[in-house]
Amino acid sequence: MLKLIRQSLPKPLKKVLSNIKKRTYDNWKKKLFFKRMQLKHIALLKKLKDKDKIKVVFLVLHKSVWKVDPLFKKMLEDPQFEPLILVCPYTSISLEGTRQDMMDVYKYFNEKGYPVISAYTAKGRRWRELSELGTDIVFFTNPYKLTKSLYYEEAYKNYLCCYVPYYFMATTHTGELSSQLNTLMLNSMWRIYWPHQYVFEQFSRHSVANGKNSKLTGYPATEVFLQSGHLKEQTKKAWKTQKSKKRKIIYAPHHTIENNDSSLSTFLQYGNFIRQLSNEYQDRVQWSFKPHPILKEKLCAHPDWGDKRTNEYYQYWRENPNTQLDLGGYDDLFNESDALIHDCSSFIVEYSFTKKPALYLLNPKNRSESFLNEFGKKIFENYKKAECKKDIVSFVDDIFNEKESQLSNKNSFFESYLDELYIKSTPSQKIIDDIKSEITH
């Protein structure tokens, strides 16, 4: 009967009732859940007081959104921690795609020499339980339900869980903050480490946790771009060897190819054009195609693209002498590059750390810059933007002619942001210090 009544209600009334439910009943449930989790966390912390080593399990679905590398390295060097990467299934794709993804992610971390295991044990033909790993603390690298419940709800309901955002949170494309920042998952976290003041304050405002479970630390993923002396010794060659010296440009398209107001991607407008440019400038410029990890599956499902056309496009970048396909980490790729052309969210801020020129491809629906939040707008003030193909060609020509000084994205707000959160202490060190202070308190 209730189902029939709901179906017969007018859409405007349904929306009003849904909003009332969110503000009352749903919020009441979240508050109760948050209080229960606080008590759970207190009990779990007590169990850690006398432990010599803390087992920290990092749940990873995609290698390209691994934004805690400096933190993981610090834990490896610290005798108080035993960090481990657990490769979890990305369940939004086919079984074969999931299997291949997990193999790729495992290989990526194994080649880095990191302790890593697969969530699936072939010998036992089952999915591993977190309890059998001796887990004390869990780090989430993604806030969404994209994997099995074992590595999502069952994890955040039963362990001391931490979260570092998988992107810099400078845009609004993922939805209203009132709903994005008030999920059960975020409210259940023992600790959330936010990259900047704006989102830290917004979480305090919108979540039933009122920000009590969060800290402002800065973004661990970008520490590497501020350690230039160290990088000169450590950096491996991320780019293909060329017969002659060429400028290095990254093309990084976002996955939101849907034709709606929240879309950032301009791939359908410029993807083929930039491929043509890579061919026209082959004697002068080498290119990296650095797509969002979800772009390929969306292109395969697109009526104008499909599997064959998508695979051919990716193959072009992988196989040509002056082009390459990069699907994993990008620290070295960024550091060795000369410029970035993109329409991504997080890269707006992340690439700013390199102090190199970047061109943002504006989606026709977002030319008012309404896709940026207050933090993003301040970072974006001096950004170079492209509204047409001519703007892209002009930027590439300037990079080839080494006119970087004319393309500077220098920003006083960004410099102040660096001074506040990165100079005295790094984000990863703040996170380590915070965890230690809590487990020894």
Q: Where on the chain are the PLM-derived regions?
A:
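Membrane-proximal basic amphipathic "stem/tether" segments
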Residues: M1-D52
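A nucleotide-sugar donor-handling region in carbohydrate enzymes
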Residues: K29-A43, P165, L181-S263
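A short, charged/proline- and glycine-enriched loop
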Residues: K46-V57, Q80-F81, K157-Y159, K243-R247
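Active-site and donor-binding regions of nucleotide-sugar-utilizing enzymes
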Residues: V57-L226
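Conserved catalytic-core segment of nucleotide-activated headgroup transferases in glycan assembly
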Residues: K67-L71, L76-E77, P220-T310, C388, ...
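Short acidic-hydrophobic, aromatic-tinged amphipathic segments that line or gate anion-handling sites
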Residues: V116-A122, N322-L327, E381-F395
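Donor nucleotide-activated moiety binding/catalytic core segment of transferases
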Residues: T121, H302-V349
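Catalytic binding pocket for nucleotide-activated donors in carbohydrate/polymer assembly enzymes
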Residues: N210, W305, S346-D419
